């Protein structure tokens, strides 16, 4: 039996609540399949599209005097509950259909970051909707947001993405796992908080990369494997070129060379690779599997996906 952290990509969960719910139902079948095979899993998820849409909608309401403005940390908390609820319900239903008596809990999770992290001066995490270049330029002029081109899919707003330092609710996660509870935690990388005087915490406007927090969580609870589910089947080098090549198996030294060659896009594949390296460096006997959400079953059989080891 292996202990596995499964990190679901926010972009892989669809573009609407309805699409997300259908994708989550299918994902629940694969995740419960891991449980029936004797594995112990903890689930994390991204929230890039969802938190951006929540923030956009609340800002629109505030600008039209239809409600108050909300800080980004609160938007992150809303996205954790919204995505977590759909995952939790789908998993509960699938477990029940399989005759498995197991509790599922979504834990709103805070993650400590450093207020002095240089990421606050260099926003890099894409969130929200995809725009054309013309639309992005117009919004940038109107609102002052920063945009980047995101892996050939369009332009997206970027926000600071500081490094996760510690998971505030870690002991609660451990206790739940030890008591045979299926835990959904660290959604969207966790709500970023900074430590103030007397060890109190305060939310800060940012989005932590969910794969980096998932790698930290995996190391903290001594997992055997980190599975990162995204929108593509493999990690590629020379992506979107005539020389595009899928990586089926690789190791962290090779990946470090590819990072030096700038093979991986910032804000999309690069943090996944950095997270894989971090997880394995903290757990040399562990492995990382990166593949698409709808190919999880095939990837677990070794038929598809990128497997990373030391």
From Swiss-Prot:
Sorted alphabetically, the keyword list is:
Arginine metabolism, ATP-binding, Cytoplasm, Kinase, Nucleotide-binding, Transferase
Annotated CDD domains: AAK_CK (cd04235)
Its GO biological process annotations read: arginine deiminase pathway
Q: What InterPro entries does the entry give?
A: AceGlu_kinase-like_sf (IPR036393), Asp/Glu/Uridylate_kinase (IPR001048), Carb_kinase (IPR003964)
Q: Please, which domain of life does this record's source organism belong to?
A: Bacteria
**Location(s) in or outside the cell:** Cytoplasm
Record-level Gene Ontology MF annotations: ATP binding; carbamate kinase activity
One short Pfam name that applies is AA_kinase
The record's EC number reads 2.7.2.2
Kindly state which reaction or reactions the protein catalyses: hydrogencarbonate + NH4(+) + ATP = carbamoyl phosphate + ADP + H2O + H(+)
For this protein, the record's PANTHER family field holds: CARBAMATE KINASE, CARBAMATE KINASE-RELATED
Q: Which family does it belong to?
A: Belongs to the carbamate kinase family.
Instruction: State the protein's name.
Output: Carbamate kinase
> Which species?
Staphylococcus epidermidis (strain ATCC 35984 / DSM 28319 / BCRC 17069 / CCUG 31568 / BM 3577 / RP62A)
Q: What is the lineage of its organism?
A: Bacteria, Bacillati, Bacillota, Bacilli, Bacillales
Instruction: Identify the gene encoding this protein.
Output: arcC
């Amino acid at each position: 039996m292996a202990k596995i952290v499964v990190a679901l990509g926010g972009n892989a969960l669809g573009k609407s609540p309805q699409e997300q719910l259908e994708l989550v139902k299918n994902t629940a079948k694969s995740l419960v399949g891991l449980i029936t095979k004797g594995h112990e899993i903890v689930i994390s998820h991204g929230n890039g599209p969802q938190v951006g849409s929540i923030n956009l909608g609340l800002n629109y309401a505030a600008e039209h005097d239809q409600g108050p403005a909300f800080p980004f940390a609160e938007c992150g908390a809303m996205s954790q509950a919204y995505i977590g609820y759909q995952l939790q319900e789908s998993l509960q239903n699938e477990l029940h259909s399989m005759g498995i008596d197991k509790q599922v809990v979504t834990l709103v999770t805070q993650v400590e970051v450093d207020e002095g992290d240089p990421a606050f001066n260099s926003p890099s995490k894409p969130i929200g909707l995809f725009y054309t270049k013309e639309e992005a330029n117009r919004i940038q002029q109107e609102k002052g947001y920063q945009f980047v081109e995101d892996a050939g899919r369009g332009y997206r707003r970027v926000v600071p993405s500081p490094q996760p330092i510690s998971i505030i609710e870690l002991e609660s996660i451990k206790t739940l796992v030890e008591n045979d509870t299926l835990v959904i935690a660290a959604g969207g990388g966790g709500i970023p908080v900074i430590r103030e005087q007397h060890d109190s915490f305060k939310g800060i406007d940012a989005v932590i990369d969910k794969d980096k927090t998932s790698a930290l969580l995996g190391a903290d609870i001594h997992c055997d494997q980190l599975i990162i589910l995204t929108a593509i089947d493999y990690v590629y080098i020379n992506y979107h070129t005539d020389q595009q090549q899928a990586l089926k198996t690789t190791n962290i030294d090779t990946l470090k060379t590819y990072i030096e060659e700038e093979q991986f896009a910032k804000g999309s594949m690069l943090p996944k690779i950095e997270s894989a390296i971090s997880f394995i460096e903290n757990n040399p006997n562990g492995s990382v599997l990166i593949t698409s959400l709808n190919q999880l079953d095939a990837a677990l059989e070794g038929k598809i996906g990128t497997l990373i080891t030391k």
